[in-house]
Amino acid sequence: MADDGMLLNFTFSDDVVKKSEPKLKGGTWRDRLSAKKIAQHRAQPRKPSDGTAAPRPVKNPNRIQVSGTRPAKRQRTDDDHDAGLRDHDRAGQSQHQHQHPRQFISSLFSKNPLPRNAEEPTDEAPAEDAKPTNAPLIDGLDTFTNLGLSPTLAAHLLTKLELKAPTAIQKASISQLLKEESDAFIQAETGSGKTLAYLLPLVQRIMALSHPTNRTDATSTTDAEGQPVVHRDSGLFAIVLAPTRELCKQISVVLEGLLRCAHWIVAGTVIGGEKKKSEKARLRKGLNILVATPGRLADHLENTQALDVSNVRWLVLDEGDRLMELGFEQELQGIIKKLDARQRPSRIPGVPTKRTTILCSATLKMNVQKLGEMSLKDAIHIKADPADEDGDAKPKNDDESAFTVPAQLKQSYAIVAAKLRLVTLTAFLKRTFMRKGSVMKAIVFVSCADSVDFHFEVFTRKLQDSDENAEDSDASDTKEKPAAFTHNTIARATAFSNPSNPVTLHRLHGSLPQHVRTSTLASFARNKDASVLVCTDVASRGLDLPNVDLVIEYDPAFSAEDHLHRIGRTARLGRDGRALIFLQPGCEEGYVEILKRGYRDGGKALTRTNADDILKRGFGGNVESENKDWEEKATDWQMDLERWALEKPESLEMARRAYQSHIRAYATHVASERSMFNIKELHLGHLAKAFALRDRPSKINVPGLRQGKDDTKKDYKAARAPAAGKKRKTPGGRDDDDIPAAADTASAAQKMRAKMKEHMAGASEFNLA
């Protein structure tokens, strides 16, 4: 086609022509995106700086009349991360700045689940005081002398120990064990005096060896040359096994009190945590009665030649169910086999030809029956006579899972939401110790050792963070504090103390060194002022702590039997006592039916406590008042606690570690009760509020394990070394900054954890013993 000479002109605006943009290469996609946004921001035309630019038109398609100008924007805070992302000038600096996770502060009294079960109406008529079921008998004919004890021992019980009459289980067991030499299984409720039930016949039998029946002077304990017939060199006659070190210490104290009327009989203890060298020295000197834990006794039977068990004629297994639960089955089998193999005829007249085994337990479960089949032969079952316990009570059918609580124990439960657990506990303790003398001692049971440490720091935080003036004023009192103060196990409970009634707080769990556990427990028992013990189940078995008026189960026990032993720390030997258990709304409310099974009357004495009433009494004072000041006070206390946790990294780590350990412990309930403690129905976000945490549960993570017993003991010794002026020596002659030392420590810790998994039960993971 020929060219016709036409020329076409097209007009385009400047916006149509697209400028070529350089393509960014290299780096990460975040860097490329950041550079692209910066380039786009620079390419935009800048606004005039004189401020005369025309206002931006406001789109108003509906023709709505707008009065006034647009209100000013609020000032951006640090939490407005979305607005900060729009600032392109900071795009290059965002990757170098530390971004804190956004915290959501929830309200204590919003979105809390309601209890499923309605509160049952209570009778307005005052309930009659129940007759104690574990008190000493008041019948004057039932004295210790009538049961077969010698006048010397009976007079010692009356004058020195102030025991006028035996309890029901002591009446049944003493007469039976003194009459026959067969094996026995003693079953009685907690706090009824089982320790004396087997110690009194034991001491009576050994005292009888000192004066045989063919002697003319039966009251004499010496031979013709003036020497005792039975002394510490005569041999070991009896062994008492207990599951925990604290129970062994208590049995030893009771036994030493009995033996003050028979000074020639020597008793001793061998328990874990003590120096084996000192124990071997005591064994070489000679003992007649030995109180021990199974693990340490098995070790001495294997490695200590000075331990002669050829004359052992009495073996007592105290708290048999706990011995099996803690995984001592293999140790007990080995101990029984070695005692049978090493038994020899005794040269001392009056010593029985065969060994008598006594098994004691408050419950009759399958593991106890298994232990009985392993250790007992043709055993007799000793139980308290129901007529002696309570004439009006009807005995229940024997059941493996049945357990009974003392009739005089006043037990209640509170349905508390997860977010309100900590403030409710604080309010209850505030109200309990408001007046001096109302409650002398209380025990708070929690599920794990990390939770014990956290709550101890929470309730004593103001004392430890006091100013220098307060420290100077208390400088004169530090010399009189017990040794446990140096390991931070005893402090003033500032969270619920008041000037008229100061309260001392103690903490106890299985990860503490043995000497610290012993001194802390002794301080709590000897303290004459108001005291509170926060502990795990290490203090729930067999301990007879004086003047314990209240037991609080902040975390429910792992089984009904553990619950029985927990509340058994109060209402002992006929004294009154109270117990309170915290339950969450939902499936945990079904645990009330299990609590009712422990009562002879079907749970009529079990009462329900309203959580709001506890908060009103603790933070407000008047329950019937409609004022909501108590909510503000509880919220202020919770907010102050959360700020304390955020200000200190060590406090935040402690709270997170306690939160994680609590959840792990929550999943270890027995199978029969796991439907009531279902971890899938546990609101983890609300539960974090009870540990002063504002983080989301998915962001709460604490790597590593908590310090064990050995690590805590090493730190304790390291802290004492500079004070004593001694230079700490490193193992192998290495310096402190030697690199292989860290590797050796890590490998040793790994081996220790592997060994603990092989030899310890599942409950030991949470430092229960």
Swiss-Prot record:
Pfam families recorded: CTE_SPB4, DEAD, Helicase_C
CDD domains membership: DEADc_DDX31, SF2_C_DEAD
Renumbered ranges of motif DEAD box: 318-321
Basic and acidic residues: bias regions: 15-34, 75-91, 707-718
Short sequence motif Q motif: positions: 142-171
Signal peptide residues on this chain, from the entry's feature table: none
EC number: 3.6.4.13
InterPro entries registered for this protein in UniProt: DEAD/DEAH_box_helicase_dom, Helicase_ATP-bd, Helicase_C-like, P-loop_NTPase, SPB4-like_CTE
Region (Disordered): 1-137, 700-769
Domain Helicase ATP-binding intervals: 175-382
Helicase C-terminal domain residues: 408-631
SUPFAM superfamilies, per the entry: P-loop containing nucleoside triphosphate hydrolases
GO cellular component: nucleolus
GO MF annotations, alphabetized: ATP binding; ATP hydrolysis activity; RNA binding; RNA helicase activity
Miscellaneous field: Present with 1460 molecules/cell in log phase SD medium.
Official protein name in the record: ATP-dependent RNA helicase dbp7
Organism of provenance: Aspergillus terreus (strain NIH 2624 / FGSC A1156)
